[in-house]
């Protein structure tokens, strides 16, 4: 068996980096394994920016990760590797001279690790609605509004029109003329639609809510917002969404093609897609999920349904913000450290 470490952190985003830092501050041995796959990494967008993080507002998320890893390098008991973890299991060992529960993880390169505590910071993946063109517009002409979503959106200077969170992004588009809200999937709920529309109105003169043929939802939303002069509701089906070819004389927009053949131009669209776990490691450990699909944890220390295993960040919370992810990592580090120091 390989040398036993105090804690293994799987995932190198804000949550995993925060957990590693907290454990380092208590002088524990920590290995962080990073698959280098992040929810806010979009290859087609050269100038991705993050927001809602004090001291790092409107800066690149990849630079944030580099800076955090650089800070961790001064801790002599910390190690970082860019490798995906393919399997993890719980076992026992007497290697330290006493019987203790361990977690064994195997990386894609065959390297194995044994740790007393395990922290999962493995993130989530977005599940897009079945609307033609949506994935091509995602994070290019579409914001997602939710106080429960991590930064993924792109600012105006990226010249794209599809975004993810109007707290994290949207300010750069505050002078828009018309914005569309896609009330489909998890967003097809009256109070959610109303909240999205009101927030989008902070950045646009007018809002169109697209229900994609759900006239019942449209009627419910109308009762809430129908008297607002800035809001209109479209109950036609959506055939596709797309971004027209940009020319020097044209603004960057998103086109919504409807079932009757008409097309509506929007400065950007707003939608919150569903998410699923980005890693299957939780299944190998038999961890419980919430009804929303997040790993079930006990706050404030973010321990899962299995003792000694913690889950932090997007994979374990509806609040998918960078700042809340980093904070959850710190709480899990405290919980793991207390258990290690108490000998359990």
Curated annotation (Swiss-Prot):
Binds 1 FAD per subunit. GO terms for molecular function: oxidoreductase activity. It is an enzyme of class 1 (oxidoreductase). One of its GO terms (biological process) is cellular response to toxic substance. Pathway: Mycotoxin biosynthesis. SUPFAM superfamilies: FAD/NAD(P)-binding domain (SSF51905). Keywords: Disulfide bond, FAD, Flavoprotein, NADP, Oxidoreductase, Redox-active center, Virulence. FAD binds at residues 12-15, 34-39, 51, 121, 314, 321-322. Disulfide bonds join 165-168. Its cofactor is FAD. Pfam families: Pyr_redox_2. InterPro entries: FAD/NAD-bd_sf, FAD/NAD-binding_dom, Ferredoxin-NADP_redctase_2. Its EC number is 1.8.1.-. Belongs to the class-II pyridine nucleotide-disulfide oxidoreductase family. Thioredoxin reductase; part of the gene cluster that mediates the biosynthesis of gramillins A and B, bicyclic lipopeptides that induce cell death in maize leaves but not in wheat leaves. The nonribosomal peptide synthetase GRA1 incorporates respectively a glutamic adic (Glu), a leucine (Leu), a serine (Ser), a hydroxyglutamine (HOGln), a 2-amino decanoic acid, and 2 cysteins (CysB and CysA). The biosynthesis of 2-amino decanoic acid incorporated in gramillins could be initiated by a fatty acid synthase composed of the alpha and beta subunits FGSG_00036 and FGSG_11656. Homodimer. This is Thioredoxin reductase FGSG_00043.
């Amino acid at each position: 068996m390989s040398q036993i470490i105090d804690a293994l952190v799987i995932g190198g985003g804000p949550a995993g980096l925060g957990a590693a830092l907290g454990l380092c501050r208590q002088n524990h041995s920590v290995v962080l394994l990073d698959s280098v796959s992040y929810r806010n990494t979009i290859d087609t967008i050269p100038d991705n920016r993050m927001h809602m993080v004090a001291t790092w507002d409107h800066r690149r998320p990849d630079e944030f990760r580099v800076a955090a890893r650089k800070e961790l390098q001064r801790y002599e008991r910390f190690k970082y590797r860019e490798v995906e973890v393919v399997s993890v299991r719980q076992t026992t060992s007497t290697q330290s001279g006493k019987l203790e529960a361990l977690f064994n993880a195997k990386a894609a390169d065959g390297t194995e690790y044994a740790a007393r505590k395990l922290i999962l910071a493995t993130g989530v993946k977005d599940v897009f609605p079945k609307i033609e063109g949506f994935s091509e517009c995602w994070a290019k002409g579409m914001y997602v509004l939710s106080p429960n979503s991590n930064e993924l959106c792109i600012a105006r200077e990226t010249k794209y029109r599809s975004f993810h969170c109007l707290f994290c992004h949207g300010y750069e588009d505050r002078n828009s003329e018309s914005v569309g809200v896609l009330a489909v999937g998890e967003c097809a709920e009256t109070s959610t639609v109303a909240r999205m529309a009101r927030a989008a109105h902070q950045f646009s003169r007018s809002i169109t809510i697209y229900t994609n043929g759900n006239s019942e939802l449209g009627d419910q939303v109308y009762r809430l917002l129908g008297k607002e002069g800035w809001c209109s509701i479209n109950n036609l089906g959506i055939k596709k969404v797309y971004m027209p070819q940009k020319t020097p004389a044209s603004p960057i927009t998103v086109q919504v093609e409807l079932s009757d053949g008409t097309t509506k131009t929007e400065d950007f669209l707003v939608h919150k897609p569903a998410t699923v776990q980005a890693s299957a490691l939780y299944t190998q450990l038999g961890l419980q999920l919430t009804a929303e699909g997040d790993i079930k944890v006990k706050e404030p220390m973010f321990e899962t349904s299995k003792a000694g295993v913690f889950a932090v960040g997007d994979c374990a919370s509806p609040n998918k913000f960078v700042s809340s992810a980093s904070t959850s990592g710190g709480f899990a580090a405290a919980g793991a450290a207390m258990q290690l120091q108490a000998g359990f």
